[in-house]
A protein has these predicted regions:
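Extracellular serine-dependent O-acyl
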Residues: 13-20, 37-79, 95-109
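Generic alpha-helix detector with strongest preference for long hydrophobic helices that associate
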Residues: 28, 32, 39, 75-82, ...
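Active-site segments of SGNH/GDSL-like serine hydrolases
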Residues: 2-40
Length: 188
């Protein structure tokens, strides 16, 4: 039904998303319902099939998040990217989902900015996705004005709602900083 509505707007890019997982393997409490995520995967697979048939985009949050959970649970059986209800993502889980979504859109490897300065030659040799001006080089100082065309994502280190993890904790399980948040400066 909803597919027919979507088809009325061919100029709009459609992306279907497979749900985050129900974490039935973490041991942070005793309220796991084995088999629940298997049922969720049936819905994920249905959405993936619909996306393929209609030539729409698809992002699977479930399988990559399950893989991360299981990898981390090998060392810490209480680890989870999900909250206390085992289905809704925790703060670090949300960053993992954002990373997976952005990566699926082809944004991995896009620079925030990259600057290279030749100090001896007193010149900017690279300024990707930014503008560098007013370069001044002396024997003990180098200054310049930097105008970014984009900004890095500010990783949150705060705890919310008594969660065990922060958004920053996700950086240990996904290469977000390298793939999505690189802002480089090199002086030679």
């Amino acid at each position: 039904l909803i597919e027919e509505v979507y088809k009325k707007y061919p100029e709009v890019r459609k992306i279907l998303i497979g749900s985050s997982p129900y974490d039935e393997t973490s041991r942070f409490n005793k309220v796991a319902f084995p088999g629940k995520n298997t049922q969720i995967l049936k819905i994920v697979d249905f959405l993936n099939a619909r996306a393929r048939e209609n030539q729409w985009g698809f992002v699977d949050f479930n399988r990559p998040m399950v893989a991360i959970n299981q990898w981390e649970q090998a060392a810490d059986s209480m680890y989870t990217l999900c909250g206390k209800d085992r289905i809704h993502p925790s703060t670090d889980g949300h960053l993992v989902m954002a990373y997976l979504f952005l990566k699926a859109q082809g944004l991995a490897g896009k620079l925030v900015a990259d600057i290279r300065i030749d100090g001896a030659g007193k010149k900017v040799t690279r300024s990707d996705n930014c503008r560098v001006s007013d370069l001044s080089v002396s024997s003990d100082n180098l200054t310049f004005t930097y105008e970014a065309k984009s900004l890095p994502y500010p990783i949150d280190t705060s705890y919310y709602d008594n969660e065990k993890h922060t958004q920053a904790d996700a950086l240990s399980v996904i290469p977000f900083m390298d793939e999505m948040n690189y802002e480089g400066l090199s002086v030679s």
